[in-house]
């Protein structure tokens, strides 16, 4: 019977959000909702007309917006205004956002995982552990692999800091997997749900295909000091909690090897997190005092600023790990598209995490123009799979996805540059020495 009690508890938690999503579908009006600690959903209806009208001014965006459901487009734009004391207030605008509509989050799940890893490391401070402590990943099952060194760190020692930098600089899948293994499913998902993101289900590694049972198991890990002394021996972990009973499917066919299976592909046991959750997780890092205490990540200010700096760094600016051959802005798709569209805009920093897989392209971003004192948040997802077939490596990223993202980011940026503010923001806290 415990499993039924658990499932009933999750149904009661998620049902209000699903009802609000259905209302949003029927009315065409977006809903800004927040799940409170007691499980109640507080909703505020906001107007979609402003954001949609603004985006429809753009001749490149308009035809895509006309097919918003075909492209599964969702957009969240947050206007930020400061008072005389430089304290921010936020106005959220939504286009076609519905928490009940599934999209594959791809590499955007790496952002909350990286943040939770920093939080977990901070909780181990009394044991002498921090983000730069040597982290040796072992293996205890046939599906697990070990890590004893990292040639991309200055001293060859693997550590969380290096993994997190790889995640934000080049979206390294193995780096995410090592963070996932450090956290374990229970800590990762339980921590995010406790902070107000109840639909979150990050339940598998990336790039490598493993059975569900193997993804429930996470590797044993040892932390060592500079002299090789053992600080912590974290054993293999196994998540026994049942997964959500989901019915998420996509496409009208998928490839299994060289064979086309003419039916939708089941995503019920793949990662899930909503766009608004990703948007609010980023806000909690950039503006921790703007969210409720229970929604904040328990990071030292030094770790938080280090994380923000890492999010805003271009791959070519990195010394460790070095990425000399990367496109300068290839990790900033909401303004630069595929990163091949020319030089970067001086003074503009974008603190973000991108993702792309199964035809979905995503970016979750905070923009700070340090030259023109302009800031805003923008998150978006688009589905680029015109033939509806998954796993065929024939996606429309370069013809639909990247152009849409680039144009969307520039449209909002141009609007923000021209928008009059009562108080210009002081963005000096984002002037890092990259």
Q: What would you call each of these model-derived segments?
A:
Residues 30-101:
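Beta-lactamase-like hydrolase cores
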Residues 70-72, 90-92, 98-100, 104-109, ...:
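Extracytoplasmic
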Residues 26-59, 259-434:
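Structured C-terminal helix/loop/strand segments within mature extracytoplasmic catalytic/sensor domains
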Residues 103-129, 135, 378:
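Active-site SXXK
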Residues 76-81, 128-149, 183-184, 205-213, ...:
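Acidic helix-start/capping segments at beta-turn-to-alpha-helix junctions
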Residues 39-58, 70, 139-140, 144, ...:
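Active-site-adjacent helix/loop patches that line small-molecule binding or acyl-intermediate pockets
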Residues 1-38:
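Bacterial Sec-dependent N-terminal signal peptides
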Residues 115-123, 169, 173, 280-287, ...:
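Short glycine/serine- and small hydrophobic-enriched flexible loop segments
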């Amino acid at each position: 019977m415990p499993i039924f009690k658990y499932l009933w508890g999750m149904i009661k938690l998620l049902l209000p959000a699903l009802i609000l999503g259905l209302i949003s579908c029927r009315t065409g009006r977006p809903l800004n909702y927040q799940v409170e600690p007691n499980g109640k959903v507080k909703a505020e209806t906001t107007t979609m007309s402003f954001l949609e009208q603004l985006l429809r001014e753009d001749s490149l965006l308009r035809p895509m917006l006309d097919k918003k459901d075909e492209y599964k487009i969702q957009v969240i734009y947050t206007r930020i205004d400061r008072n005389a004391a430089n304290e921010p207030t936020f106005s959220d605008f939504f286009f076609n956002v519905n928490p009940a509509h599934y999209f594959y989050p791809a590499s955007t799940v790496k952002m909350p995982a990286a943040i939770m890893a920093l939080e977990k490391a901070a909780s181990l401070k009394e044991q002498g552990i921090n983000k730069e402590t040597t982290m040796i990943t072992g293996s205890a099952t046939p599906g697990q692999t070990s890590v004893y060194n990292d040639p991309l760190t200055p001293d060859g020692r693997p550590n969380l800091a290096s993994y997190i930098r790889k995640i934000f600089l080049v979206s390294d899948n193995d780096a995410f997997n090592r963070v996932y293994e450090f956290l374990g499913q229970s800590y990762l998902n339980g921590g995010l749900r406790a902070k107000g993101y109840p639909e979150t289900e990050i339940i598998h590694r990336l790039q490598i295909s493993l059975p569900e049972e193997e993804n429930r198991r996470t590797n044993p890990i040892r932390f060592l000091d500079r002299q090789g002394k053992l600080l912590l021996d974290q054993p293999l972990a196994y998540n026994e909690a049942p997964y959500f009973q989901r019915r998420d499917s996509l496409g009208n066919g998928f490839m299994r090897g060289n064979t086309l299976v003419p039916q939708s592909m089941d995503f019920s046991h793949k990662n899930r997190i909503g766009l608004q959750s990703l948007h609010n997780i980023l806000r909690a890092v950039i503006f921790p005092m703007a969210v409720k205490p229970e929604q904040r990540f328990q990071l030292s200010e030094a770790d938080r600023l280090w994380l923000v700096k890492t999010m805003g760094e271009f791959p070519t600016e990195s010394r460790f790990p070095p990425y000399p051959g990367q496109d300068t802005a290839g990790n900033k798709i909401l303004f630069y598209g595929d990163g091949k569209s020319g030089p970067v805009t001086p003074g503009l920093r974008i603190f973000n995490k991108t993702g792309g897989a199964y035809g979905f392209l995503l970016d979750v971003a905070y923009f700070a123009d340090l030259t023109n004192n302009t800031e805003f948040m923008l998150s978006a997802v688009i589905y680029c799979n015109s033939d509806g077939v998954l796993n065929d490596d024939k996606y429309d990223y370069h013809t639909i996805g990247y152009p849409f993202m680039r144009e969307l980011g520039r449209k909002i940026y141009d609007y923000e540059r021209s928008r009059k503010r009562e108080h210009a923001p002081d963005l000096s806290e984002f002037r890092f020495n990259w």
